[in-house]
């Protein structure tokens, strides 16, 4: 029996785990002494590992390459040589016929690791010749990256998660740490124990609201109106840090002019928050010696997501809560390596290390390093644009790695149509997902636990994860698969191990250069920027100590007028749907749904959280099946009745197959980042009279879908 150190493959807290291996099989997980988790884990950390053993609770592991010879036909098992040759030939032909931008690729924010994401974006740019590479940050924290880049020059958390423990105030805005990042929630609790004030801003009574000094239960979709009113109070009452504003920022007067029009009284109807509460929150935040803002997708998944990020950041600038310990702006990234996927350049506008593709010097640098004459100068397509790009014939092929857009993207009917329109769909994954079932080519890869590499935690912390067991089937690592396709397409790409890849990318990224494999070791946690390979440089806990990463070193004030969400409530669709997370399952559920303990927590068709008064008015009982309708479709789900949701809104998680709430969500893309407005969809909830028939319908539909995916996986 042995123990292998790794990093949890679920959320981005970056928890260290010891996998206990007996006779070549993982038998349990134990908490390790990681910097963030400090010997603790959540239930996913303890019980979220047995998917690797192909439990087939939900869907089987992919075990051999497969090709679908014609649309409508079955997937057929083939050798690796045949599959890789086929992919190389088809991609080359599409590139030749339609141009490189006819091919869309994705990185993966899950267990593939930073090295694989680096190789994938290099493949897209140097081999295909396109910047069409993206990752799931597009549908979650893309607005955080864009907004923070504009405001402070850096799109990541400005503080270490551990710093939360010793701040004087935690401002939790549009973020549910107990469900999304339980170990981060522990640090919020630590802060409370240490005397910190807690402000929670969320329409629901989330778990953190139970320990909050103040819970601002604002109306769905009113974020900017509230933030502008808080800024108004801080300036009006002379609570802002004049020295910080004068020496380290610019744009204050323009900001002041906008928030002047947002008195607390003027936004009471918009926000549903009293003027006195707004003033109390503004004073509490401004008067704290140090204050850390934590936000999640309750900020970013709105049409005005980027603007909300910048408005939050302006509050921090206004009060001098940047560039010092325990104070800052912190988008707590969702999936375990979504920060890493962005760090590695799995974005359509940046090379690794956030070096922008439109800068000629950056293009020249990476072209030289990768041995190509030139690289494309224009920003690539976003993955959320795929339905539109495919419909207009701009994208003809998609190479999807470790993502399940047919489950996780908005307006799923449009996404399905896009995949039908494509000439070639390549899926590289570990499970037969909905997206994999639509593929023309399946490339089965090793899983977390079967390979090694580096993840980046939400707070910029590089950590190594290690191989625990040998893969049982005919699998290759993700970076090996991509490298072999590149070589077959005439671009020799040969790596012997992940360290060779890591060292290549380090030398191209000054902020990452000092984070060597040796320095990370088993339990090391190196937060970029880390620019020196010496042991003296252990990374950077908090950012902006001396200057901001903007061109002139100054933070940029910004806000704008509040605009109502795009989807409108009507008599036909009188309630708001907001998609959320839950603690027991993760993302598209392909991993957690195949873990025995986690799968036992809940099953299809999932839940719609609904307020007790709304349920009573509609004649809906707790646990009853209901129909939820939107302008884009309808789904069946189970009512979860309580006083936690606000009246007039329902909340659903997106991982369920039958109760797939993304069937309902209208995309309503942000004009800046093309992030869908998952947090505001007009819906109607209807009770179902014949509950017995509805229960049987769920069972039948679930079994049909599981059977279809299992048959596809077994070819």
From Swiss-Prot:
Nucleotidyltransferase is among the record's keywords: no
Annotated EC: 1.17.98.4
Keyword Metal-binding: yes
Molecular function in Gene Ontology: 4 iron, 4 sulfur cluster binding; formate dehydrogenase (NAD+) activity; metal ion binding; molybdopterin cofactor binding; oxidoreductase activity, acting on the aldehyde or oxo group of donors
Reactions this protein catalyses: formate + A + H(+) = AH2 + CO2
Binding residues annotated for Mo-bis(molybdopterin guanine dinucleotide), in chain numbering: 110, 140, 176, 179-180, 201-202, 204, 221, 223, 297, 335, 404, 408, 428-429, 445, 478, 581-582, 585, 587, 678-679
InterPro entries named among the record's database cross-references: Asp_de-COase-like_dom_sf, CT_Formate-Dh_H, Formate_Dh-H_N, Formate_DH_asu, MoPterin_dinucl-bd_dom, Mopterin_OxRdtase, Mopterin_OxRdtase_4Fe-4S_dom, Mopterin_OxRdtase_prok_CS
PROSITE patterns linked to this entry: 4FE4S_MOW_BIS_MGD, MOLYBDOPTERIN_PROK_1, MOLYBDOPTERIN_PROK_2, MOLYBDOPTERIN_PROK_3
Class of this enzyme: oxidoreductase
Domain of life (superkingdom): Bacteria
Binding annotation for [4Fe-4S] cluster: 8, 11, 15, 42
Signal sequence interval, chain numbering: none
GO cellular component terms listed in the entry, alphabetical order: cytosol; formate dehydrogenase complex; membrane
Positions of the catalytic residues: 44, 140
Expression induction or repression: By formate. Repressed by oxygen, nitrate, nitrite, and other electron acceptors.
Protein activity control: Inhibited by aerobic conditions.
PANTHER family: FORMATE DEHYDROGENASE H, RESPIRATORY NITRATE REDUCTASE
Chain's role: Decomposes formic acid to hydrogen and carbon dioxide under anaerobic conditions in the absence of exogenous electron acceptors.
Subunit structure: Consists of two separable enzymatic activities: a formate dehydrogenase component (FDH-H) and hydrogenase-3.
UniProt-recorded name of the protein: Formate dehydrogenase H
UniProt organism field: Escherichia coli (strain K12)
Gene: fdhF
